[in-house]
Amino acid sequence: MNVEPGFSSQFSVPGSWFLEYHHTPVLLAEVVAGLLPRPGGRYIDGTVGGGGHAAAILEASSPDGRLLGIDCDPAALAAAAARLAPYGDRVTLVRGSFREIGQLAATSGFVQVEGVVLDLGVSSYQLDTPERGFSFQAHAPLDMRLDPDAPVTAAHLVNNLPEQELADLIFRYGEERGSRRIARAIVEARQRKPVTTTDELAAIVTRALGGQRGRIHPATRTFQALRIAVNNELASLEAALPQIIDLLAPGGRMAIIAFHSLEDRIVKHTLRAEAQAGRLHIITRKPVEASIEEQRANPRSRSARLRVAERVS
């Protein structure tokens, strides 16, 4: 296996983050069917995570297909290194953001590739590791960084943004109608003491919205908004898509899995614009969703939407 200088399975991240990395890749068969991996092909997984999609692509492109795996999370890369070790030097792993996929691919010798996949969801491991601060169902630091070296945490935004900016952020990225009430409640709470844990924030949001109604937790949209802002997710996606198209050889395919309407809208509009410009042919006229069986086995797949397109010129 080829790895970037200094890469190892023991990154300098908190020891509690080295719990067994678990993540079930969504729409696995559909991604492979969309990309059509073949022997000798070169592929990029821009969100390699635990290596689930990557392993399937490597199997389908045996015996000599190659894959570049990119991830900003060192725990994910460590898990990918272990899972993909049997594929030896067919695999190259690099730590970085898919926002810089063009540069990372060029540096690693992956240009004019046959396929690229992005799975934009937060992994089960990240959600279920309290220290990562993604879940409102645990007492944990209000972090939410996918890259543990990133400078801004959710706690920083919650405790420092002016009320109007906080309301705008929650409305824009969480599509939360109660954003003004939530922002007001957060500001009132932080005037008494800083809001530093996930359960604190969840309780503030729940009270601001008048308690829980229905199956969806009242804090769901606020947590989504903060996670998107902390990790600059939408801007990263907008930056990455044109680079991915440039990386594809004629006939090469891109498969993008989105998990909420903001992401899916960006993907849909980009693919349509590039198709109208004659650079892409859209394979999936409508986004592919997980089967009922997959949704039952993996409830987190319910919101997944896969779009596939092929480079034509």
From Swiss-Prot:
Location in or out of the cell: Cytoplasm
Region spans: Disordered: 293-313
Gene label: rsmH
GO BP terms in the entry: rRNA base methylation
Binding site for S-adenosyl-L-methionine: G51, G52, H53, D71, F98, D119, Q126
Reactions performed catalytically: cytidine(1402) in 16S rRNA + S-adenosyl-L-methionine = N(4)-methylcytidine(1402) in 16S rRNA + S-adenosyl-L-homocysteine + H(+)
Molecular function per GO: rRNA (cytosine-N4-)-methyltransferase activity
Documented EC number(s): 2.1.1.199
Classification via InterPro entries: RsmH (IPR002903), SAM-dep_MeTrfase_MraW_recog (IPR023397), SAM-dependent_MTases_sf (IPR029063)
This protein's name: Ribosomal RNA small subunit methyltransferase H
Chief subcellular location: cytoplasm
Naturally occurring in which organism (per UniProt): Roseiflexus sp. (strain RS-1)
Family: Belongs to the methyltransferase superfamily. RsmH family.
UniProt keyword annotation of Ligase present: no
Function: Specifically methylates the N4 position of cytidine in position 1402 (C1402) of 16S rRNA.
Short name of one Pfam family: Methyltransf_5
One GO CC term, this protein: cytoplasm
Keywords, sorted A to Z: Cytoplasm, Methyltransferase, rRNA processing, S-adenosyl-L-methionine, Transferase
